[in-house]
Each structure stands twice: as structure tokens, then as C-alpha cells.
């Protein structure tokens, strides 16, 4: 284990944040999913973009499948991320409601290899904790940080964290390579 204070602070916060998220999910996950769909389509429905990436929820992540369905109904391309390997950015494959998914690394679900690869303009990003400055704490493998950095090098993208309001913390410990979010979407609205 590292003795780097940021690494230690992140590890401690991950444990606390997972408990906090589990409790929020148990207390109202289904209700929160509906609220996030309403808030999300309200904000995203009027924006100009072609492709949005979401995620298939695992563990106690906030369920954005209702929002993904609404976005697909608007005619936009919806993609889900694929973990190709450690140290690599995510790949995004087109998803359509009702499509069969495969299970990949770390328990993620994604479209099969023959699905069209897409580059998102907007990313809906899962997380364990966030703060008022839109800093995000993930699971620690750096997939979204690498992906956002790679995308932002050649085009503007909108990164929206998705979380229960209870996942907000005073401050997320950060390293220089951590990518901030542009917005955070919770069951209470957009921050």
C-alpha cells in the first residue's frame, strides 16, 4: 500500500462513499432513477449533440436506463463504455433499447463487438463521490480520467457525473491527472 497522502485519502473516502451510496440506493433507488430521467432529459433534451454515452448500472450505481431510453427516443446515438484493458481509455459502442449485452471486465455490461463504435459528445459518468467543484471520485482504475483526457485533447465534450445527492462530500482528494466533471446530475437536479 502506498504512503502517498492522496492515495490514502482516496482509499478511505471510497470506503465511506460506497456505504453512503448503498444506503441512498436502498432508500430510494427506483424513485431516484425516475427523477434523474426527468431532470436529465430536461437538461439534455435542448442541447445540441449527436452522441451520448451512459453506463449500465452495477452495484448500487444510480440507474440511468430510463434516461438512456428517453435519449434514444430523441433520435440521438446512445453508447455504452467497454473496458478494453488496464491503462487504456474506454471504447464506446452503440446501444439501442432491448439490445442484448455482454458482460465484461469488472462486472460491466456492454454491447457486443459488432456494435458500431462511437465517439461521445456527452458522457454520463458513474461515481462514488463528488464535491461542489465537480471533482469526482471513481473506483480507482482511472478509466474515465484517461478517456476524458483523450477526448478533450481533440474536441469539447460535456462530462456529467450521475449520483445520489447523498454522495456529495466536502472535498474530493485529487491528483493532477484527475478530470473534473462539467455538471453533476442527481435526483434533486443539476449541480
Give each language-model segment a name.
Residues 2, 88-191:
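Conserved phosphate- and dinucleotide-binding cores of soluble alpha/beta proteins
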Amino acid at each position: 500500500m502506498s504512503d502517498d497522502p492522496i492515495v490514502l485519502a482516496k482509499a478511505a473516502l471510497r470506503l465511506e462513499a460506497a456505504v453512503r451510496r448503498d444506503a441512498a440506493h436502498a432508500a430510494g433507488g427506483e424513485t431516484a432513477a425516475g427523477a434523474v430521467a426527468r431532470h436529465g432529459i430536461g437538461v439534455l433534451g435542448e442541447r445540441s449533440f449527436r452522441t451520448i454515452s451512459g453506463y449500465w448500472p452495477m452495484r448500487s450505481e444510480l440507474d440511468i436506463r430510463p434516461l438512456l431510453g428517453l435519449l434514444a427516443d430523441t433520435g440521438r446515438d446512445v453508447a455504452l463504455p467497454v473496458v478494453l484493458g488496464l491503462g487504456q481509455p474506454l471504447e464506446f459502442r452503440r446501444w439501442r433499447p432491448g439490445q442484448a449485452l455482454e458482460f465484461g471486465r469488472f462486472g460491466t455490461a456492454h454491447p457486443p463487438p459488432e456494435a458500431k463504435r462511437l465517439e461521445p459528445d456527452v458522457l454520463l459518468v458513474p461515481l462514488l463521490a463528488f464535491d461542489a467543484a465537480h471533482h469526482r471520485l471513481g473506483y480507482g482504475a482511472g478509466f474515465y480520467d484517461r478517456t476524458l483526457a483523450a477526448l478533450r485533447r481533440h474536441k469539447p465534450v460535456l462530462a456529467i457525473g450521475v449520483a445520489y445527492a447523498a454522495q456529495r462530500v466536502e472535498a474530493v482528494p485529487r491528483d493532477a491527472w484527475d478530470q473534473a466533471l462539467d455538471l453533476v446530475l442527481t435526483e434533486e437536479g443539476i449541480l
